[in-house]
Design a protein with these regions (language model features):
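Short, hydrophobic/aliphatic alpha-helical segments
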Residues: 1-11
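Structural signature of FAD isoalloxazine-binding scaffolds in flavoprotein oxidoreductases
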Residues: 27-36
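Short, surface-exposed connector motifs at secondary-structure boundaries
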Residues: 67-75
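Conserved phosphate/anionic-ligand binding catalytic regions in large, soluble enzymes, centered on
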Residues: 9-27
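Gly-rich Lys/Arg/Thr-decorated short loops/hinges at beta-loop-alpha junctions or inter-strand turns
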Residues: 35-47
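Histidine-anchored nucleotide/phosphate-binding helix
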Residues: 52-68
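Short helix/loop capping segments that flank catalytic or ligand/cofactor-binding pockets
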Residues: 23, 43-45, 113
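Hydrophobic alpha-helical positions that pack around
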Residues: 75, 81-140
Length: 140
């Protein structure tokens, strides 16, 4: 079973409120895969906990997803103030010899907004009423 089919079978959906099926979002070819690890919601630390405690799994999954989408550039975008998370992910990238890179975002709200993230990471601007895919990016 392909990775895309596994994602579909698992019923994975986005957490942005609309519940958009992840397999549909990732069924594309892009230049950039950006993993949104900015975690802008006040008092939430789930992503941060995962980055510290499951860093190798995150890096491996990002690399696999990047390969699946044909991404030439794979980034985990997180806030520059996340020192422990940056250290854990950096070690995981080295240990796994992964093509994944970290992008350190400024610590502001809403750093995790898709349009802001695309612009910060790639320098590209998503057109009005557009989506990141319009400029060769997918955010996960």
């Amino acid at each position: 079973m392909t990775l895309l089919k596994q994602i579909e079978a698992a019923g994975i959906v986005g957490c942005g409120g609309a519940g958009f099926p992840t397999h549909k979002k990732l069924n594309c070819k892009v230049e950039y895969l950006i993993v949104n690890a900015a975690e802008c919601e006040p008092l939430l630390r789930t992503d941060r906990w995962l980055m510290v405690n499951k860093a190798e799994e995150i890096v491996t999954a990002a690399a696999m997803t990047g390969a699946m989408t044909g991404a030439a550039h794979i980034y985990i975008a997180l806030k520059e103030t996340y020192d422990e998370e940056i250290n854990a992910l950096t070690e995981a990238i080295k240990k796994t010899a992964s093509p994944v890179k970290l992008f350190r975002m400024k610590n502001f709200y809403p750093a995790g907004d898709e349009q802001i993230m695309v612009c910060d990471v790639t320098g590209r601007t998503v057109p009005p009423s557009g989506i990141p895919l319009d400029v060769g990016c997918v955010i996960s």
